[in-house]
């Protein structure tokens, strides 16, 4: 018998932790005969020597055979006994709201990640991977067949623990219950010292888990994993992590490991898996789900019998101490292919001020700015003295503060249908280099931000919703068509800080999308007419008891389109109320198209309309704004995969 322990460790100075911890993942490989001893290797080596001396470790070619189906009821009585023993040890140190079914899947999914060509489809934040101290330990065990070894890698198992919590095959109730943030917080504070190692080894040697180290392949792998998880959580202090580890990270990248590829969202502090019934994710708490009560666990030696399926605990809620930033939330849905998420930096912000005139201007210095549409530019609207605005011109490369209120949607439509990066609609605002702010007398920073995102993460649409019919006009629309459906639209209404007690905001969204996604549609004829609509809006001021009448002349764009075929439609109307809470309110809707084009779109047109109405109410006045968008593309031949460009105007 030969033993080789190689310990390699280093720390990145920029991301130095106050303590070093070690995580383990075991793999059988070939290795020469050598012997190097360290504190960590000594304990692992002694453990391996004892197991090998007792002829408890054997190598087989198919270690995954017994765990290809996640069903603990198919296990033997001994396996089931060890499972409950492990779970009791797990919960005795760090109680988490984790059901038996979820815990079973976590353990059994560990084995599936070494299958060839497997791909991680994780929705868990993996950004700490880039900041970890790396440690690799190698233990060589000789057998009659060949020299085999076990590799323990801190990097590998840290990734493994995150990846197994959100596997593609996990049941939705399990995915919704997994305590992502709690587990991530624990992993930052693992104190694997010599004393804790000795305690863990002692508890493990006295546990019923050791009796499962038999010659059966399934039990070998089951208990290797059991020991790893037991060692991990037995030495965890259960102290929440500090969010500073997330702040100085690079942009989203693809991470390739021995378990496959995944997207690492470094900017996502509160990455959350959306519920199957709601896309509104404003609460940091773990959703509650009713799970059937499992069978009673058997009585095991040196363990406590569990009487309930779940153990309730208050989740750790990360806090952000910046003055102008609320929690960043990104709704991420697993996809069939890895892709980065794009965040624009040219979204204007809103503020409210006193005593001036609202005016929207175009940045004429932008050489890429499209020509001005007639009768729609340089519109100035007079409003009462209690409001004013300021337009600030910024450089194209300057990051506007409103980008911290980004809500991104990536969502599968049905089954295995996902949006493709080729299927994109790009909407560029005419004031993409300008910022219009509105603040009230009590604040110096914007208090409201309205942003609409359309289609995939590579596609976005920003509405600068203002009071008194101040509309953000999109001058140029680029339509790209493919054989896949668009996915999602999200409206985010986010306060920068708590609104005054006398201020409430109500936003109503109505979406109607029309399309001709079939090559059978031979033509589309569109007639556009303009009319002038006179409206009168009233608003009270601080200085007057009576209402001040304000005459408005609003151009209306009427579009009448006739097609040869039937146009599928999807409509959605929703309201959201924003009061004194500082949390964002999110509306999400999908099903923009009802069918999938089977071939390139030929002689067809894509058109869609939507409007957003926002009403801001204070104790003494109410201001409303309605944003209407109408886009009509001309008749086009064979637009796939080419690009068509149309003009659009909001009124």
From Swiss-Prot:
The residues forming the signal peptide are: 1-56
Q: Which domain of life is it from?
A: Viruses
Where are the compositionally biased (Low complexity) regions?
275-292
Q: Which UniProt keywords apply?
A: Glycoprotein, Host cell membrane, Host membrane, Membrane, Signal, Virion
Disordered: where is this region? 275-303
GO CC list: host cell plasma membrane; membrane; virion component
- The glycosylation sites annotated in the UniProt record are 74, 97, 147, 208, 223, 234, 254, 302, 355, 378, 395, 469, 502, 520, 546, 603, 620, 631
Gene that encodes it: U47
Q: What is the name of the protein in this document?
A: 120 kDa Glycoprotein O
- Give a single Pfam family match: Herpes_U47
What lineage does UniProt assign to this protein's organism? Viruses, Duplodnaviria, Heunggongvirae, Peploviricota, Herviviricetes
The protein's matches in InterPro entries, at most eight in alphabetical order, are given as:
Roseolovirus_U47
Protein family (similarity comment): Belongs to the herpesviridae U47 family.
């Amino acid at each position: 018998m030969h033993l080789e322990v190689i310990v390699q460790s280093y720390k990145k100075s920029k991301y130095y932790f106050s303590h070093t911890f070690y995580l383990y993942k075991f793999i059988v490989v070939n290795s020469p005969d050598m012997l190097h001893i360290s504190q960590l290797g000594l304990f692992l080596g002694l453990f391996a020597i004892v197991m090998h001396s007792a002829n408890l470790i054997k190598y087989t070619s198919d270690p995954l055979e017994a765990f290809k189906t996640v069903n603990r009821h198919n296990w033997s009585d001994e396996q089931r006994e060890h499972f409950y023993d492990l779970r009791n040890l797990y919960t005795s140190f760090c109680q988490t709201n984790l059901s038996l079914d979820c815990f079973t899947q976590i353990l059994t999914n560990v084995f599936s990640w070494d299958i060839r060509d497997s791909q991680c489809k994780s929705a868990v934040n993996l950004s700490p991977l880039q900041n970890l101290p790396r440690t690799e330990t190698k233990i060589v065990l000789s057998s009659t067949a060949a020299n085999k070894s076990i590799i323990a890698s801190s990097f590998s198992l840290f990734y493994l623990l995150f990846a197994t919590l959100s596997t593609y095959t996990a049941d939705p109730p399990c995915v919704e219950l997994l305590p992502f943030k709690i587990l991530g917080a624990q992993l930052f504070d693992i104190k694997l010292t010599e004393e804790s190692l000795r305690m863990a080894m002692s508890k493990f040697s006295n546990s019923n888990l050791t009796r499962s180290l038999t010659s059966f392949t399934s039990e070998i792998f089951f208990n290797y994993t059991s020991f790893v998880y037991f060692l991990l959580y037995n030495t965890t202090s259960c102290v929440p992590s500090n969010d500073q580890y997330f702040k100085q990270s690079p942009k989203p990248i693809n991470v390739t490991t021995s378990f496959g590829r995944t997207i690492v969202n470094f900017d996502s502090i509160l990455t959350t898996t959306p519920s199957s019934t709601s896309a509104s994710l404003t609460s940091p708490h773990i959703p509650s789900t009713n799970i059937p009560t499992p069978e009673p666990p058997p009585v095991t030696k040196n363990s406590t019998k569990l009487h309930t399926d779940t153990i309730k605990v208050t989740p750790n809620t990360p806090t952000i101490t910046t003055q102008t930033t609320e929690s960043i939330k990104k709704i991420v849905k697993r996809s069939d292919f890895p892709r980065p998420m794009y965040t624009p930096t040219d979204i204007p912000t809103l503020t409210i001020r006193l005593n001036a005139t609202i005016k929207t201007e175009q940045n004429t210095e932008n050489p890429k700015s499209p020509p001005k549409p007639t009768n729609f530019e340089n519109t100035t609207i007079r409003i009462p003295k209690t409001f004013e605005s300021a337009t600030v011109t910024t450089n194209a490369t300057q990051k506007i503060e409103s980008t911290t209120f980004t809500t991104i949607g990536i969502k599968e439509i049905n089954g295995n249908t996902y949006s493709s990066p080729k299927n994109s609609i790009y909407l560029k605002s005419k004031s993409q280099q300008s910022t219009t702010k509105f603040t009230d007398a009590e604040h110096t920073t914007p208090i409201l931000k309205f942003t609409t995102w359309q289609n995939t993460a590579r596609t976005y649409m920003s509405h600068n919703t203002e009071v008194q019919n101040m509309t953000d006009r999109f001058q140029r629309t680029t339509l790209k068509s493919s054989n896949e459906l668009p996915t999602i639209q999200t409206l985010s209404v986010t306060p920068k800080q708590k609104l005054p007690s006398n201020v409430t905001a109500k936003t109503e969204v109505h979406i109607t999308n029309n399309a001709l996604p079939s090559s059978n549609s031979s033509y589309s004829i569109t007639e556009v007419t303009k009319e002038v609509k006179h409206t009168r809006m009233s608003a009270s001021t601080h200085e007057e008891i009576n209402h001040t009448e304000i005459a408005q002349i609003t151009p209306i764009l009427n579009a009448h389109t006739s097609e040869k075929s039937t146009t599928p439609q999807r409509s959605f109307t929703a309201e959201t109320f924003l009061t004194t809470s500082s949390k964002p309110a999110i509306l999400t809707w999908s099903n923009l198209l009802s069918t999938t084009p089977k071939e390139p779109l030929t002689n067809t047109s894509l058109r869609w309309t939507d409007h957003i109405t926002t009403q801001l109410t204070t104790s003494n006045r109410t201001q409303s704004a309605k944003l209407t968008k109408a886009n009509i593309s001309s008749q086009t031949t064979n637009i796939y995969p080419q690009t068509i460009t149309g003009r659009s105007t909001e009124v």
